[in-house]
Amino acid sequence: MKSTTNDNNAKYYIKITKDGPYLVYGISNINQEIIVPDDDGESWIYEKGKKFACQSNPTALCRCGHSNEKPFCDGSHSKVQWNPKETASKENVLNNSTVAKSDTFTLYDNQELCSYARFCDAYGGVWSLVKHNSHNANNGVIEHEIAHCPSGRLMLYNNKEGYFYEPKFDPSISLIEDSIIKISGPLWVKGGIRIESSDGTNYEIRNRVTLCRCGKSKNKPFCDSSHIFSNFNDHLMKEEKEKIKTEMLIEEEVYQ
Protein backbone atom coordinates (compact mmCIF):
# COMPACT_ATOMS: atom_id res chain seq x y z
CA MET A 1 0.00 0.00 0.00
CA LYS A 2 1.35 3.41 -0.96
CA SER A 3 2.68 5.57 1.89
CA THR A 4 0.37 8.37 2.97
CA THR A 5 3.12 10.72 4.13
CA ASN A 6 4.51 13.73 2.27
CA ASP A 7 7.21 16.37 2.65
CA ASN A 8 4.87 18.57 4.70
CA ASN A 9 4.73 15.84 7.36
CA ALA A 10 8.50 15.75 7.89
CA LYS A 11 8.36 17.78 11.11
CA TYR A 12 6.01 15.24 12.68
CA TYR A 13 7.47 12.02 13.98
CA ILE A 14 7.52 9.70 16.96
CA LYS A 15 10.72 8.25 18.41
CA ILE A 16 10.35 5.15 20.56
CA THR A 17 12.90 5.07 23.36
CA LYS A 18 14.31 1.67 24.26
CA ASP A 19 13.03 1.34 27.82
CA GLY A 20 10.94 4.46 28.11
CA PRO A 21 8.34 6.74 26.54
CA TYR A 22 7.35 7.84 23.08
CA LEU A 23 9.07 11.10 22.13
CA VAL A 24 6.63 13.05 19.98
CA TYR A 25 7.89 15.78 17.66
CA GLY A 26 5.85 18.54 16.03
CA ILE A 27 2.53 17.94 17.80
CA SER A 28 1.07 20.80 19.85
CA ASN A 29 -1.94 19.06 21.41
CA ILE A 30 -3.11 15.56 22.33
CA ASN A 31 -6.89 15.18 22.13
CA GLN A 32 -9.29 12.65 23.59
CA GLU A 33 -11.44 10.80 21.04
CA ILE A 34 -14.37 9.17 22.83
CA ILE A 35 -16.11 6.20 21.18
CA VAL A 36 -19.87 6.80 21.10
CA PRO A 37 -22.41 4.10 20.14
CA ASP A 38 -25.33 4.17 17.71
CA ASP A 39 -28.89 3.33 18.76
CA ASP A 40 -28.03 -0.38 18.66
CA GLY A 41 -25.10 0.02 21.03
CA GLU A 42 -22.42 -0.46 18.34
CA SER A 43 -19.40 1.84 18.05
CA TRP A 44 -20.27 4.51 15.51
CA ILE A 45 -18.66 7.94 15.99
CA TYR A 46 -15.89 9.67 17.92
CA GLU A 47 -16.68 12.60 20.17
CA LYS A 48 -14.00 15.13 21.05
CA GLY A 49 -13.02 15.24 24.72
CA LYS A 50 -10.32 16.93 26.73
CA LYS A 51 -7.33 18.57 25.03
CA PHE A 52 -3.83 18.23 26.50
CA ALA A 53 -1.27 20.85 25.48
CA CYS A 54 2.24 19.63 24.70
CA GLN A 55 4.60 21.90 26.64
CA SER A 56 7.81 20.86 24.91
CA ASN A 57 9.16 19.56 21.61
CA PRO A 58 9.62 16.67 21.83
CA THR A 59 6.93 15.72 24.31
CA ALA A 60 7.29 12.42 26.18
CA LEU A 61 4.13 10.29 26.20
CA CYS A 62 3.69 7.34 28.56
CA ARG A 63 3.89 3.87 27.02
CA CYS A 64 4.35 1.77 30.19
CA GLY A 65 0.81 2.50 31.41
CA HIS A 66 1.88 3.54 34.91
CA SER A 67 2.41 7.30 34.71
CA ASN A 68 0.48 9.40 37.20
CA GLU A 69 0.57 12.27 34.70
CA LYS A 70 -1.08 10.52 31.73
CA PRO A 71 -0.93 10.97 28.83
CA PHE A 72 2.54 12.30 29.63
CA CYS A 73 5.51 10.36 30.97
CA ASP A 74 6.50 10.97 34.61
CA GLY A 75 9.39 8.50 34.76
CA SER A 76 7.32 5.62 36.15
CA HIS A 77 8.71 3.27 33.48
CA SER A 78 11.98 3.13 35.43
CA LYS A 79 10.25 2.17 38.69
CA VAL A 80 7.79 -0.53 37.62
CA GLN A 81 7.97 -3.96 36.03
CA TRP A 82 6.93 -3.98 32.39
CA ASN A 83 8.23 -5.29 29.07
CA PRO A 84 9.18 -2.43 26.71
CA LYS A 85 10.49 -4.69 23.93
CA GLU A 86 9.30 -3.97 20.40
CA THR A 87 8.18 -7.14 18.64
CA ALA A 88 6.03 -5.87 15.76
CA SER A 89 6.92 -6.51 12.14
CA LYS A 90 8.10 -3.67 9.93
CA GLU A 91 6.67 -5.37 6.82
CA ASN A 92 3.91 -3.93 4.69
CA VAL A 93 0.69 -4.57 6.63
CA LEU A 94 -0.94 -6.11 3.54
CA ASN A 95 1.47 -9.05 3.73
CA ASN A 96 -0.22 -10.59 6.77
CA SER A 97 -3.79 -9.79 5.79
CA THR A 98 -6.75 -11.98 4.98
CA VAL A 99 -8.96 -10.91 2.08
CA ALA A 100 -12.69 -10.52 1.45
CA LYS A 101 -13.89 -9.52 -2.03
CA SER A 102 -16.84 -8.21 -3.96
CA ASP A 103 -17.09 -6.70 -7.42
CA THR A 104 -16.50 -3.22 -6.03
CA PHE A 105 -14.18 -3.73 -3.06
CA THR A 106 -11.35 -5.86 -1.72
CA LEU A 107 -11.12 -5.77 2.07
CA TYR A 108 -7.72 -6.53 3.61
CA ASP A 109 -7.72 -7.49 7.28
CA ASN A 110 -4.52 -7.61 9.37
CA GLN A 111 -5.85 -9.03 12.63
CA GLU A 112 -2.57 -8.51 14.50
CA LEU A 113 -3.31 -4.78 14.50
CA CYS A 114 -6.80 -4.99 16.03
CA SER A 115 -7.34 -2.39 18.76
CA TYR A 116 -10.91 -3.55 19.53
CA ALA A 117 -12.65 -0.28 18.69
CA ARG A 118 -15.44 -2.38 17.10
CA PHE A 119 -16.61 0.08 14.44
CA CYS A 120 -16.44 -2.86 12.05
CA ASP A 121 -19.29 -4.67 13.85
CA ALA A 122 -22.20 -2.36 13.02
CA TYR A 123 -24.84 -3.39 10.46
CA GLY A 124 -23.80 -7.03 10.51
CA GLY A 125 -20.07 -6.43 10.17
CA VAL A 126 -17.95 -4.86 7.46
CA TRP A 127 -16.89 -8.26 6.05
CA SER A 128 -20.49 -9.22 5.33
CA LEU A 129 -21.24 -5.74 4.00
CA VAL A 130 -18.38 -6.04 1.50
CA LYS A 131 -19.29 -9.55 0.36
CA HIS A 132 -22.99 -8.76 -0.09
CA ASN A 133 -22.70 -5.28 -1.56
CA SER A 134 -25.15 -5.66 -4.44
CA HIS A 135 -25.61 -2.50 -6.51
CA ASN A 136 -23.11 -0.74 -4.17
CA ALA A 137 -25.90 -0.21 -1.63
CA ASN A 138 -23.49 -0.53 1.31
CA ASN A 139 -20.71 1.75 0.04
CA GLY A 140 -21.32 4.58 2.51
CA VAL A 141 -21.52 2.33 5.57
CA ILE A 142 -18.45 0.35 4.48
CA GLU A 143 -16.36 3.49 4.03
CA HIS A 144 -17.59 4.87 7.36
CA GLU A 145 -16.55 1.72 9.22
CA ILE A 146 -13.14 1.64 7.54
CA ALA A 147 -12.49 5.32 8.26
CA HIS A 148 -13.27 4.81 11.95
CA CYS A 149 -11.02 1.74 12.33
CA PRO A 150 -8.21 3.54 14.20
CA SER A 151 -5.47 0.93 13.88
CA GLY A 152 -5.58 0.52 10.11
CA ARG A 153 -6.28 -3.18 10.61
CA LEU A 154 -8.92 -2.89 7.89
CA MET A 155 -7.88 -1.54 4.48
CA LEU A 156 -10.32 -1.06 1.62
CA TYR A 157 -9.35 -1.25 -2.05
CA ASN A 158 -11.74 0.02 -4.72
CA ASN A 159 -11.45 -2.56 -7.50
CA LYS A 160 -13.23 -0.47 -10.11
CA GLU A 161 -11.36 2.78 -9.56
CA GLY A 162 -8.01 1.29 -8.54
CA TYR A 163 -7.19 2.95 -5.22
CA PHE A 164 -7.16 2.34 -1.46
CA TYR A 165 -9.84 4.30 0.33
CA GLU A 166 -8.40 6.36 3.19
CA PRO A 167 -9.99 9.22 5.12
CA LYS A 168 -8.16 12.54 4.98
CA PHE A 169 -6.39 13.14 8.28
CA ASP A 170 -4.05 15.93 9.28
CA PRO A 171 -1.07 14.73 11.35
CA SER A 172 -2.35 14.34 14.91
CA ILE A 173 -2.30 12.11 17.98
CA SER A 174 -5.36 11.25 20.07
CA LEU A 175 -6.22 9.24 23.17
CA ILE A 176 -8.99 6.75 22.48
CA GLU A 177 -11.50 6.44 25.31
CA ASP A 178 -14.16 3.74 25.06
CA SER A 179 -17.34 5.04 26.71
CA ILE A 180 -19.22 1.82 25.89
CA ILE A 181 -17.09 -0.60 27.90
CA LYS A 182 -15.45 2.02 30.18
CA ILE A 183 -11.90 1.22 29.07
CA SER A 184 -9.09 3.54 27.97
CA GLY A 185 -7.68 2.66 24.57
CA PRO A 186 -4.46 3.28 22.67
CA LEU A 187 -2.81 6.32 21.18
CA TRP A 188 -4.35 7.01 17.78
CA VAL A 189 -1.72 8.30 15.36
CA LYS A 190 -3.22 9.85 12.23
CA GLY A 191 -2.07 11.43 9.02
CA GLY A 192 1.06 9.53 8.02
CA ILE A 193 3.31 10.35 10.98
CA ARG A 194 6.66 8.56 10.85
CA ILE A 195 7.33 6.19 13.75
CA GLU A 196 10.98 5.44 14.47
CA SER A 197 11.93 2.31 16.38
CA SER A 198 14.37 2.39 19.28
CA ASP A 199 16.86 0.70 16.93
CA GLY A 200 16.73 3.67 14.53
CA THR A 201 14.72 2.00 11.76
CA ASN A 202 11.25 3.09 10.70
CA TYR A 203 7.94 1.28 10.76
CA GLU A 204 5.78 1.45 7.66
CA ILE A 205 4.24 4.92 7.44
CA ARG A 206 0.45 4.66 7.52
CA ASN A 207 -2.54 6.97 7.76
CA ARG A 208 -4.10 5.12 10.71
CA VAL A 209 -2.00 3.61 13.50
CA THR A 210 -2.67 2.74 17.14
CA LEU A 211 0.21 2.62 19.61
CA CYS A 212 0.07 0.75 22.91
CA ARG A 213 -0.12 2.92 26.02
CA CYS A 214 -1.21 0.31 28.57
CA GLY A 215 2.21 -1.38 28.46
CA LYS A 216 0.72 -4.85 27.94
CA SER A 217 0.70 -5.34 24.16
CA LYS A 218 2.56 -8.34 22.77
CA ASN A 219 2.89 -6.55 19.43
CA LYS A 220 4.65 -3.39 20.60
CA PRO A 221 4.76 -0.63 19.70
CA PHE A 222 1.31 -1.30 18.25
CA CYS A 223 -1.86 -1.93 20.20
CA ASP A 224 -3.11 -5.54 20.20
CA SER A 225 -6.24 -4.96 22.36
CA SER A 226 -4.44 -5.86 25.59
CA HIS A 227 -5.94 -2.77 27.23
CA ILE A 228 -9.28 -4.61 27.14
CA PHE A 229 -8.06 -7.67 29.03
CA SER A 230 -6.04 -5.62 31.53
CA ASN A 231 -8.95 -3.21 32.14
CA PHE A 232 -6.70 -0.25 31.44
CA ASN A 233 -8.10 3.03 32.71
CA ASP A 234 -6.23 6.32 32.55
CA HIS A 235 -8.94 7.96 34.73
CA LEU A 236 -9.02 10.94 32.39
CA MET A 237 -12.62 10.26 31.40
CA LYS A 238 -13.62 10.47 35.07
CA GLU A 239 -11.78 13.78 35.42
CA GLU A 240 -13.53 15.15 32.35
CA LYS A 241 -16.97 14.09 33.64
CA GLU A 242 -16.28 15.67 37.04
CA LYS A 243 -15.15 18.89 35.33
CA ILE A 244 -18.34 19.04 33.24
CA LYS A 245 -20.47 18.33 36.33
CA THR A 246 -18.73 21.14 38.25
CA GLU A 247 -19.23 23.57 35.37
CA MET A 248 -22.94 22.68 35.23
CA LEU A 249 -23.33 23.27 38.98
CA ILE A 250 -21.62 26.66 38.67
CA GLU A 251 -23.97 27.62 35.83
CA GLU A 252 -26.99 26.60 37.93
CA GLU A 253 -25.80 28.78 40.81
CA VAL A 254 -25.31 31.75 38.47
CA TYR A 255 -28.88 31.53 37.15
CA GLN A 256 -30.54 30.97 40.53
Range-by-range predicted roles:
Residues 1-40, 50-56, 93-95, 103-104, ...:
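Intrinsically disordered, low-complexity linkers and tails
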Residues 70-81, 115-133, 144-161, 220-231:
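Iron-sulfur cluster-binding cysteine motifs and their immediate structural context
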